[in-house]
Amino acid sequence: MQGSRPLVRVVRLGLVSYQEGLRLQQVYVDRHRSGPAHSLLLCEHPPVYTTGIRHQPYPASRLDPLRLLGAEVHRANRGGLITFHGPGQLVCYPVLDLSGFRKSVRWYVAQLEKTVVSACGSLGVTATTSPHTGVWVGDNKICAMGIHCGRYVTSHGLALNCNTDLSWFSHIVPCGIEGKGVTSLSRELRRDVSVHEATPHLLAAFGEHFHCELSEDA
């Protein structure tokens, strides 16, 4: 039934630092303590490299040169290895209580991947999933994913390359996957595709694959 769909509030944060993004995610995570407060935080970050928690710490000898490029470096409580966030990248942090959807982290990640594949398709880019996490166009990753889930409340999420400066990725092995590259909507379509243009496609696909209603404050 239409009325039984979960309601998810879309929050557009604009350009915010990675640290501020972490702080705001925690604010929305905490709101779930008093009841369902499903939220979808959308933002862009200034240049920043982030590492996950499930693997060996990235050595300082490899992090310091990244700071010299003018980027911040942070360790986050998400899965995955090192990746880059920066302007021109649509970052989406779903803060959902999976009890209101399906209490399965595997299902959740699969729905995120389907969401991005559909969004890319509606823009004219044929993207796929692979044994590696994220969404790909051939051997090039167009969207990175890394999530955290505590007591079935999600945080962190995905980063879709729209018109990102891809040269930032040349200084790392994105997500620790050797022999693979990165791409963007702009590169694939050979025209400029902004975060503003891509956002409604991602939101429509999210509502479809998570079977939810999206709302925004006027």
Predicted regions and their residues:
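Long, positively charged amphipathic alpha-helical accessory segments at protein N-termini or as interdomain linkers
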Residues: 2-4, 10-13, 100-143, 147-218
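N-terminal lobe of the biotin/lipoate ligase/transferase fold
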Residues: 1-137, 141-142, 193
